[in-house]
Amino acid sequence: MEGIFNSKSLYEYLEEQKQAGISKTKEISLYYKATSKSVGDDEYSLRIWLDYIRLLMDGTKDVTEARETFKMIKMRFCKFYNYWEAYVRFEIEAGNGSLCKILQHSIDFVKVKEFTEKKRVLEYLECVMSYARNGEDLSVFCRGPETSFKPGAQVLSPFEARIGEQSKNKVLKKEHEESGPGHRDDGKNLLSRSGRAHLAPDECKENDNKNRAREDGASLSPSFAAKSKNCGATFGTIPIRFEKEDYSQGITMEINAALGRTSPEGSNSSPRSGAVRSRERIIIKGREIEILKQIGKGGSSKVYKVLFGSNVYALKRVELIGDEKMLSSYINEINLLYKFKGTSEIVEIIDHEVGEDYLHILLEYGETDLSKIIRKGGLSMNFIKDVWEQMLLIVKRVHIERIIHCDLKPANFLFVKGRVKLIDFGISKVIRNDTTSILSEEQCGTVNYMSPEAVTQNKSKVARSSDIWSLGCILYEMVHSNPPLHEYPNLIQKIQRLQEYSEFKYTSKNKAAVMVMKECLARDPKKRPTIDNLLNHRFLTGEMCLESLRELVEKILKIDGGDRVDPEHVDRIAEQLHSTHRQDQA
């Protein structure tokens, strides 16, 4: 890359590297270097930046960095229609509640600029604004499968192409209607998946009341409406990011007691955001389930708090539009949940249903998860020890079944009636009976909790010790209120820090806690403790450490007799105290 000095060559080089099947970590590193080069502000450079933003979004649920990157490159690429389309699509998919405000600022900004595509950009922004103000379905502005990139060519965007085709169909339909009843057009191409007509930019406000009236008659919101049959034909070809989300809200009485806080339940999600309105119902396997409210979402899935009979459950609903690898991860998760069904350590699966368009998973309902409790702050050491011990027992249960979870993080530990349980087995790996590790084809997990060996290279060996690292990161976050890599603001820096890792900073005054964290976060996987080692660690058992006793005895003797202290005398006193303590404990 050092010998590349123009944007076209740089873009082509990056595409060649992707075609060669490089790892996600390597790809991120290449794009980070590419965006640092000065190669001009043309469409090739823009495409490189947009691909970089996509990588940032693939690596985290936090949209802050991607949003800041869009703002940073705005002055460089505001003259290109593709910049505005990508930025608006990003804000729509991020669910930004201030979309209208952002659009108005963008329109005002473009109006005072002069560039070739100004008219086209303004028409696009004003049409999105009209849709947003009138509560229209904004999915029409989200890109479909991308075609080959040809800078300089005046190619219609996916939205414009669809709008143009629909406008053409409307004219044809009108001609058929005017020619009499013998000439009928069913008008299928005029409708989106939600059943609403897409209008040309100058028709955005037309017939809005009719559209609303038509929707008000539906028993379920668009997110639960039946999809068109042709959606199945695109399965496996439309790239979409499936995110794993937490699915609980509120804090149980037991957790409140531990934290000394109360937390009221949140209000129902807005139907306009795609959530199901309260008290609506859905039929799964012939059984009626009452929707109480939406409690989580991410990618193509949403999670609802539901009532089935007299019991409350969590219902995960996954829209089956995505690559087959991600669908496979959900099937893997279901199989593993059934494997652990009936165990006290794992959230229980109640039932599931795989339909043509949706996957439903009915799960045990939890009041909150560990990430929410950590964000509240001020955790006592007794609470941390209790949760830590439960987490160790959970992971021990998983490891006994020869399974590496690969994505342990606070959001995946759910509190159910005060007891900690594990959720989300989407990317877990099963170890064969004749091995102690697995060969991972790609990086998996969340960077803040990923072990160095999981991110350093493609096809790296990952063993149970990788989960031990993740547990150490979670303990670090419970003790320090932030994960070990919190001081590094972006994904690239986090990965580079892991690759160059020596040791993290520890500010806790609890020496036993620091000791167990350091042991879990050893760079060499072979030097990390086992689950049994951690369960018997003095951080949990309270057993006095001989080394700590030596330090204490030495300090006392120095106070009493000066700087010169006989090391053998120190050892004898420390060992005697240690032996006495063990006898008292017995």
Curated annotation (Swiss-Prot):
<dbReference type="GO" id="GO:0005524">
    <property type="term" value="F:ATP binding"/>
</dbReference>
<dbReference type="GO" id="GO:0106310">
    <property type="term" value="F:protein serine kinase activity"/>
</dbReference>
<dbReference type="GO" id="GO:0000776">
    <property type="term" value="C:kinetochore"/>
</dbReference>
<keyword id="KW-0808">Transferase</keyword>
<feature type="compositionally biased region" description="Basic and acidic residues">
    <location>
        <begin position="167"/>
        <end position="188"/>
    </location>
</feature>
<dbReference type="InterPro" id="IPR000719">
    <property type="entry name" value="Prot_kinase_dom"/>
</dbReference>
<dbReference type="GO" id="GO:0007094">
    <property type="term" value="P:mitotic spindle assembly checkpoint signaling"/>
</dbReference>
<dbReference type="GO" id="GO:0033316">
    <property type="term" value="P:meiotic spindle assembly checkpoint signaling"/>
</dbReference>
<feature type="binding site">
    <location>
        <position position="316"/>
    </location>
    <ligand>
        <name>ATP</name>
    </ligand>
</feature>
<feature type="binding site">
    <location>
        <begin position="295"/>
        <end position="303"/>
    </location>
    <ligand>
        <name>ATP</name>
    </ligand>
</feature>
<feature type="active site" description="Proton acceptor">
    <location>
        <position position="407"/>
    </location>
</feature>
<dbReference type="Pfam" id="PF00069">
    <property type="entry name" value="Pkinase"/>
</dbReference>
<dbReference type="GO" id="GO:0004674">
    <property type="term" value="F:protein serine/threonine kinase activity"/>
</dbReference>
<keyword id="KW-0418">Kinase</keyword>
<dbReference type="InterPro" id="IPR011009">
    <property type="entry name" value="Kinase-like_dom_sf"/>
</dbReference>
<keyword id="KW-0723">Serine/threonine-protein kinase</keyword>
<dbReference type="InterPro" id="IPR027084">
    <property type="entry name" value="Mps1_cat"/>
</dbReference>
<dbReference type="GO" id="GO:0034501">
    <property type="term" value="P:protein localization to kinetochore"/>
</dbReference>
<protein>
    <recommendedName>
        <fullName>Serine/threonine-protein kinase MPS1</fullName>
        <ecNumber>2.7.12.2</ecNumber>
    </recommendedName>
</protein>
<keyword id="KW-0067">ATP-binding</keyword>
<dbReference type="GO" id="GO:0098813">
    <property type="term" value="P:nuclear chromosome segregation"/>
</dbReference>
<dbReference type="GO" id="GO:0005634">
    <property type="term" value="C:nucleus"/>
</dbReference>
<dbReference type="InterPro" id="IPR017441">
    <property type="entry name" value="Protein_kinase_ATP_BS"/>
</dbReference>
<feature type="region of interest" description="Disordered">
    <location>
        <begin position="167"/>
        <end position="223"/>
    </location>
</feature>
<comment type="function">
    <text>Involved in mitotic spindle assembly checkpoint signaling, a process that delays anaphase until chromosomes are bioriented on the spindle, and in the repair of incorrect mitotic kinetochore-spindle microtubule attachments.</text>
</comment>
<keyword id="KW-0547">Nucleotide-binding</keyword>
<dbReference type="InterPro" id="IPR008271">
    <property type="entry name" value="Ser/Thr_kinase_AS"/>
</dbReference>
<dbReference type="GO" id="GO:0004713">
    <property type="term" value="F:protein tyrosine kinase activity"/>
</dbReference>
<feature type="domain" description="Protein kinase">
    <location>
        <begin position="289"/>
        <end position="540"/>
    </location>
</feature>
<dbReference type="InterPro" id="IPR011990">
    <property type="entry name" value="TPR-like_helical_dom_sf"/>
</dbReference>
<comment type="similarity">
    <text>Belongs to the protein kinase superfamily. Ser/Thr protein kinase family.</text>
</comment>
<dbReference type="GO" id="GO:0004708">
    <property type="term" value="F:MAP kinase kinase activity"/>
</dbReference>
<feature type="compositionally biased region" description="Basic and acidic residues">
    <location>
        <begin position="199"/>
        <end position="217"/>
    </location>
</feature>
